[in-house]
Amino acid sequence: MLEELKEKVYYANMELMEKGVVLYTWGNASEMDRNTGYVVIKPSGIAYESMRAEDMVIVDLNGNIIEGKWKPSSDTATHLELYKAFPEIGGITHTHSTYATALAQAGSSIPAIGTTHADYFYGEIPCTRSLTEEEVEGAYEKNTGLVIAETFAEKRDMILHTPGVLVKNHGPFTWGKDVAESVYHAVVLERIANMYCITSFMQKNTDMPAYILKKHYLRKHGEHAYYGQT
């Protein structure tokens, strides 16, 4: 079932390791097939080096295993809440990449202060609030997804224009139209976080004019985008 999608999700997860944003068994990526309502996701605790496409797990939106010999990622419920909250999202990635996670631990959002940021994220990359003790002791992973959705509640139309978030005390989640795009955004987010940390060390108070942010984002993603060969 969904053999091509399992291959796609497998290779997307492997790219996380190849790009250096995950170690050991850290991180996970998934994609939802909106036709069946099923999600293909990395198995829990399986080392990337030994993982194969057939190890990917298929679950429904209630978290029931539809196909697979392993348990799905421990973060599955977070992915599912995001798929339910935002139908535009087709793929999700979670990592513990160094700089993005450091900022999440600090509770720091990432303001748009440079054009690299503006090329991919239209505005600040937000950091969520901390989960309450009740949220952590209850359905922790589900509540993580709900807190992310809460963070975008008043700007849900920006969900694909700001395709990532830092979960306070935890780490980054990114998304896109499919799993490949969500992985791409995870790699880019880590580089942006790196640049922001270095810039903040050099210059505490810096910003970027809104017109530069708008120009760089829209030349790549706007109605009249002209970046690339399309």
Language-model-detected regions and their locations in the chain:
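Glycine-rich flexible loops
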Residues: 1-230
